[in-house]
Amino acid sequence: MAGSRTNDIKVYCSFCGKSQDDVKKIIAGNNVFICNECVALSQEIIKEELAEEVLADLTEVPKPKELLDVLNQYVVGQDRAKRALSVAVYNHYKRVSFTESRDDDDVDLQKSNILMIGPTGSGKTFLAQTLAKSLNVPFAIADATSLTEAGYVGEDVENILLKLIQAADYNVERAERGIIYVDEIDKIAKKGENVSITRDVSGEGVQQALLKIIEGTVASVPPQGGRKHPNQEMIQIDTKNILFIVGGAFDGIEEIVKQRLGEKVIGFGQNSRKIDDNASYMQEIISEDIQKFGLIPEFIGRLPVVAALEQLNTSDLIQILTEPRNALVKQYQALLSYDGVELAFDKEALEAIANKAIERKTGARGLRSIIEETMLDIMFEIPSQEDVTKVRITKAAVEGKSKPVLETA
């Protein structure tokens, strides 16, 4: 019932007392009525309270050890990177909380945005996702290779902010305290140390565009994205409290580190030392190396925290398959359990899966596709075979030389 007379009885709002003649619409409940004006007022009150809850949440930021404990539940290895991220994230949200209550004469704390360097499949994206989830803040992922500077065909950097606003259900106050992860940042590095006189649509220009929102600005974001709707009303969002994490593989940067350390490696004296492998060189990266790779100094300066991730080995990948709370083996065991079937992986099968991922150079992100390949036929047949009680995945099954072993009742 809404906004009309019933049996010539005039209806009044149970909250403000206005009659149906004084408002646009009245909604009827069980002996209760509410007008459209009270509905709108209620929505505003709820919105304000939710915004206050966001601010309140930030006053209870998990300590670095607590953040590390969460990361350890889901992410295998990368201990040094996890510690660096835990400290950086804690300091960032402590800064946000401090800024909300600071006086004008207090110390101005700068943002600690993060640069993650590591090979494909080493866990960069997953680390950022896990941190955002543990903090219950909006999270958005963007690919740097799809971005172009304003005026060129491609995606504007402002669209990254739109993704975050959408993740926050268009609650701008909540989005302003979210986390944005920009992947493939190494792909927009300048091609060489000399600045080209031609326009660099996908390189330095994009770095300059990203620089503005990373360091903190009030950006105008088109709610429908892109440049197709020039007359649309813009959303204003302040990026000063958004944590930006950027990541990339930076293939070949270890060679730059080797060149810089060359004199120390072959020379004599107290500064001389020997570094054994590329993984160790990754831990020696400094801003000078990143600049030589092709990121501009201003951009590097806005990313003071550098976390280097190492290539995952067979042992690491087996741990990823079996140990975390959301381990892939546990997920597939749960899937088959819904059909009343037990799933087991031989130790050799797990090693074969890990080795395949290493051969394909996909790291942890390639593990699921390998299991899917191995189990596709089984997952197709099992729901129709009610006598099957157990499936065992062998090394031969992973290598495609035989089918998984089935046990029946």
Swiss-Prot record:
It comes from the Bacteria. GO terms for cellular component: HslUV protease complex. Transmembrane segments: none annotated. The keyword Calcium does not apply. GO terms for molecular function: ATP binding; ATP hydrolysis activity; ATP-dependent protein folding chaperone; protein dimerization activity; unfolded protein binding; zinc ion binding. Zn(2+) binds at C13, C16, C35, C38. Keywords: ATP-binding, Chaperone, Metal-binding, Nucleotide-binding, Zinc. ATP binds at P119, T120, G121, S122, G123, K124, T125, F126. InterPro entries: AAA+_ATPase (IPR003593), ATP-dep_Clp_protease_ClpX (IPR050052), ATPase_AAA_core (IPR003959), Clp_ATPase_C (IPR019489), Clp_protease_ATP-bd_su_ClpX (IPR004487), ClpX_bact (IPR046425), P-loop_NTPase (IPR027417), Znf_CppX_C4 (IPR010603). Component of the ClpX-ClpP complex. Forms a hexameric ring that, in the presence of ATP, binds to fourteen ClpP subunits assembled into a disk-like structure with a central cavity, resembling the structure of eukaryotic proteasomes. ATP-dependent specificity component of the Clp protease. It directs the protease to specific substrates. Can perform chaperone functions in the absence of ClpP. Belongs to the ClpX chaperone family. This is ATP-dependent Clp protease ATP-binding subunit ClpX. It comes from Streptococcus pyogenes serotype M1. The lineage of its organism: Bacteria, Bacillati, Bacillota, Bacilli, Lactobacillales. The gene is clpX.
